[in-house]
Amino acid sequence: MKNLKSLLSFLFASFWVAIPLIALYACACAIATFIENDYGTSASKAIVYNTPWFNFLHAYLLVVLIGTFINSKALERKRYASLFFHSSLIFIILGAAITRFFGVEGLMHVRENSAQSSFESADTYLNITLNDEKKLSLKTSLTFYYSKRLKPIHATLDHKPLILEPLEIYKQNAIKKDDATILVLKATYNGVSRKFNLIKNNRNEGVEESEMFKDDKLSLSFGSAYIELPFQIKLKRFELERYAGSMSPSSYASEVEVLKLDNTLIKPYRIFMNHVLDYEGYRFFQSSYDMDEKGTILSVNKDPGKIPTYLGYAMLILGALWLLLDKKGRFLKLSRFLKSQQIASFLLALILISPFTSSFANEGQIDMHGGKSAKIERQKIENPANKEDSKSAILERLKRLREYSKDHLKAFQRLQVQDFDGRIKPLDTIGIEYIHKILRKDDFQGLNAMQVLLGIMFFPNDWRSVKMIYTSNKALRKLIGTPLDESRIAFRDAFDSRGYKLKNLVEEVNQKSPNARNELDKDALKVDERINLVYTLFSAQFLRIFPSDKTTAWLSPIEAINSPNKEISSVATEFLKNIFSGFDDALKTNQWDKVEKTLKDLSVYQQEHAKNLYLSSSKVDSEIFLNHTNFFNSLTLPYIFLGLLLFIVVISSLVKNTIPNIWLTKILYMAILLCAIAHSVGLILRWYVSGHSPWSNAYESMLYIAWASVIAGFVLRSKLALSASSFLAGIALFVAHLGFMDPQIGPLVPVLKSYWLNIHVSIITASYGFLGLCFVLGILSLVLFILRKQGRFNLDKTILSISAINEMSMILGLFMLTAGNFLGGVWANESWGRYWGWDPKETWALISICVYALILHLRFLGSQNWPFILASSSVLGFYSVLMTYFGVNYYLSGLHSYAAGDPLPIPTFLYFLVAIPFALVILAYFKRHLSLPKLV
């Protein structure tokens, strides 16, 4: 009996089982993401996510979690904070189970002035109809096309047995993201057997096939089933807004009515992005639309597991805060240990405040809602540059533009423009924003951004043939018809005699849900946006420089010319005549007086009519200063160099068992402090210029991570911590300037206008900073382990201090990563109707949570070498974060292009990034024997 009790305790209440289970769970999720990448979503669900063994793994984890609580006597030991925090996982798992087994989701297609009382399920069914009357839907997991063990399905129809024997199931084509499937099966009914070839398309819609079984007609389809609703949704009107001068959609909405089944009106409603219809437990989200714009596609969701799941999320966040403040908790025990080591730790106060004061989100995009007319009536203005010219004349103009305009850009740079979000900014900023987005860099052929902008505006015909629009996908370049080895295309390349070459592709991509888009789709949308931006520059729709007395909206030239206000129309016409003729003359004679006078007159007009919107001279100067000083990028090398130098100084003193050179350490300390002050000034300057806290996009989030890292190093008052944080700050700034993040100052409202999204991204991004610090501290610890010798007790003391800092940083990073990930689920559920969809990005975030949870619980296995284990695992565990942040985009979603393509080459430095830490772990292993004292 005692042995049985011990066995049960081991199997259901032991960390020796719980930790391997977490590792197994993380590995299963990781494998599933690669299966999805190679074979599609249906394959990953059939092999992992929707399987009984994966469901069992969740249940086993839940039982072991409860059993471990009971076995550890957490309640008797008054570990209330830990009990409350971990209990949240019970509610989250139970809520997910309720959603998984009892929730329904699908799509509803409604045409204008018609109503629907059913929707198509997201799950796959075998739909059976007997004699066009009796219907039966059998839920099936026949979705993986390599399955060889297909089991027969038995059912009863009209009191007669029906046997369905799947013979074969395979994909219709080789495209990864295309789940179009053919199911071959044999149906036996009424003593007769017939063979069916059932086709399911990429939208999970089945094509019905019929056969006669003696006197009975049996119809089968493989795909969605229709789920009936107790009410109707009627579409009154579908609205689609497009970007000015293009066919690309910017937003869409459905005006609907909720009706009873007898057509009695219940209520009208407007459904659009992030504005959901809730009725009788069902939620309706705007998903897509018909090509003729006369119908809408709504995502439908009914989730009975929402309440326990949300309760679990709330408990998790509150429990995390409680654990950080609990005197009996690990975090404050580590803090007290650090104080005993004469290291002041105010890290907790810094981090608990900093992430919640930020609200940065995804990269901002330019929202082009300008004039409705795309045709600027330049024929009214004699512009010599508008005429077609020879190639030599064009090259000569470009040469003069490069040479003559360089010293006369200031007046253009300071000209104030209102962007499409209503923000007033200097034209210099507009130029950098637009040109950076079009080119993916800030200069081109010896021209800076402002010169490129002026060239496009004043000589549009010259620039229609210039290959400047960046593309990243060879398949897209093949579609457009440009050389595959040239990453840039010309505006003219995107058009032929039939019109815009990307029109159909962009329309198709916008029909897809975001998680169904492949790399070709994503690049098509980006290139489409760049082409729209170039067109906006050609047509001067962006040049909103004429203030209106009646509204706060400024007018573009065409809007001003066509304005009923004769004063504005006259000013705009005169300005355009003078500026075009003056600019053309300036490039011929290098005389800029007329241009500068015209711009000065316009500035005076703006100041008189814009009132409070007109920017002060200091704010304009500050913004232009930020645009051209490359402020934050200049701090990258100093941060890295000073951090490494301080590390070498400290390590050298430890090896020699001497005190570090006081003057040298003070100089390095002051140098890093000056960098931090400059960093802070830069952030404050961005704050002043933008009018809001500078955490509005991904670029600024990296600036924030770098700043928080270096400040944390100062607060900890440890030379090693400061060297690590300085190095990490430099790396963060390096990543921010790699070229895939737009550095422009954007509006506070993100592209996806959601408060939850702000919180989600801010907390998760901040967590990466702390887990990155764990990586650096782990490397430091391993190096110190390698340098250990008898008699170097100060080395051991330093390792223990770093270990405590490392564990505290990891606790904070894990809490923030977990809270941020689940809050992202809240945003997704409130915006799209699904808080978890096993998307590779969110799955790898979950894997990272599992990895760091596993690391922090390894100490419960009773090892005596916790500092070494923590150092090694904090280094190796960081690869899960790198996979989440970079790997998912480049080696899962972006591994192949649409239908074909070469794998993305693995950079050489990546091999060293993996090999060096592993080598350090192996070398440190031989000197691993060091225990952390008991914490009180």
Predicted feature locations:
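Internal alpha-helical transmembrane segments
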Residues: 46-125, 297-346, 358-361
